[in-house]
Amino acid sequence: MFMQKFRAAATSNRSTLCIGLDPDLARLPEHLPRDAAGIVQFNQAIIEATSDLVCAYKPNMAFYEALGSAGWLALKQTIASIPSHIPVLLDAKRGDIGSTAQAYASAAFDELGVDAITLSPYMGYDSLQPFLERADKTCFILCRTSNPGGDDVQNLLLDNGEPLFLKIAELVAKRWNSNHNCGLVVGATYPAEIATIHQRYPELPLLVPGVGSQGGDIEEVLAAAGEQAIINVSRSVLYASGGSSFAEAARKVAQAFLVPKQALNHP
């Protein structure tokens, strides 16, 4: 189960850092081929350089789907390269109904064998049900995302005067989490909102993107959510260098993100 593997990796590596494996062909180091094979080489080098620093890896489905069947194979090879004791969280943001949702769930959990997935709640419970029924898998549901456009919908006020994203958090915590396999996606760019969500629903793990390139502050996130925060960093680590020493550079950046966490636990 994702959370068990996450807790074990977080303890052994003294880290709640999740590295997003979002390989952009245009940004691969110059010596690597700009194709699916290059992506696999790139990802494997990043994984080898950072596997003792992370609590999870999060491949983003879109970067692999864009390459067709070769990209799908690259995704499977990437997942196979991740040490078995480190959980894999698929960033897919799925959200559909009926047999379509069932097919998405089967693709993620059976074909790819990932431990967790991100989901969109916009279509309601039945669009999430095929995922939530898999009690051995964890579902991170979009709640307060780090992109500025999230305000267009997530910050709409309901009749009780509270924003929609808090209703999403309530639904997840009180109605959709019967298998205790739910978490929320909350952006690091909104630490006050993270604190509110964590105070109301402290049992929910929080996947927190937006640290690094998007401007989120890791110390503010840890102050708001503590041990429940899974800090995702992608571009800042992946593209720390465009040269042949890119993996070593990625490791140094990843290590820098560990300092606040270690300071928090070991004053």
Swiss-Prot record:
Q: Which reaction does it catalyse?
A: orotidine 5'-phosphate + H(+) = UMP + CO2
- Which keywords has UniProt assigned to this entry? Decarboxylase, Lyase, Pyrimidine biosynthesis
EC numbers for this chain: 4.1.1.23
Question: So, what pathway does this thing act in?
Answer: Pyrimidine metabolism; UMP biosynthesis via de novo pathway; UMP from orotate: step 2/2
* Keyword Lyase recorded: yes
Q: What HAMAP family does the record tag this protein with?
A: OMPdecase_type2
Name the UniProt record assigns to this protein: Orotidine 5'-phosphate decarboxylase
User: Which organism does this sequence originate in?
Assistant: Herpetosiphon aurantiacus (strain ATCC 23779 / DSM 785 / 114-95)
Organism lineage reads as: Bacteria, Bacillati, Chloroflexota, Chloroflexia, Herpetosiphonales
